[in-house]
């Protein structure tokens, strides 16, 4: 288990403030957030690569807060691979054993062969990094990070430098690595689709603070904070305080709520949904994969996502009267912490 308690870091004007984080042994957690949120700083603090002002970092009941990086049994892999250009693939991988006092133990040769097979890199062991594709370099970087069976594998945006096709392949391999080796993994990304696919749990970070954390399926279906909802593309976020609306939405007190655009229904005829409104069509935007349609009534504007075929079927035009709405199960209750 990884336990980060009351972590405080100051790097120039940037701060990590009283950060709390728990990761179960063998868990795949994704640290998700926008650029400059502090994701990589947290990883490097766990790895011992940045100084901390205060706080405690425990791994498997061992206090590693003040240990040197080489004594933590933690590996970190970056998006730019960091392979040594003068070493071939097998030497780059074995370099991961440099701090092991028993690095000549036969168990590590067995470990090496298992990783080569798992990552499908047996045919490139003699090549130099300059002769490898981005995907091959990332596989080698992962093998180097995993050799020696670290307690924790830290991944800093491992997919961001890859083209889309290779990215999908490496995603599958990361999932396979975790399922096969049961290594505790913390991965940093700004891509919530990546996070949703790979993570068992997600911690969302912004401006050096954990905004929200929990099981990935729960957070992506119904985020609990305004920041998380906005970050994941939920455009319909409203403050409800009018007594009539509070009663209509079944809310006990003034609250923020969110509705995913894809959960809003539009029709030229009355529709059977829990919350039904009449209004007019506002702006219409073609986003290639879907059409974003604004539905406006006297109280607020809603964004709805429609497939192109359904949009064409409805023959919607700006200013056209429509019925729109959504179901109670799709109403997301949010707290303001941004």
Question: Can you name each region flagged by the protein language model?
Answer:
Residues 12, 247-338:
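Non-catalytic connector elements of ABC transporters
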Residues 55-63:
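Conserved ABC transporter NBD signature motif
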Residues 32-34:
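The feature captures the beta-strand-to-loop junction immediately N-terminal to the Walker
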Residues 4-7, 14-24, 55:
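Conserved beta-strand
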Residues 40-43, 140:
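ABC ATPase nucleotide-binding domain helices that frame the ATP-binding cleft
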Residues 47:
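Helix-to-loop junction immediately C-terminal to a conserved catalytic motif
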Residues 53-56, 207:
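Conserved coupling/switch loops of ABC nucleotide-binding domains, chiefly the family-specific signature
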Residues 73-75, 88-224:
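ABC ATPase nucleotide-binding domains
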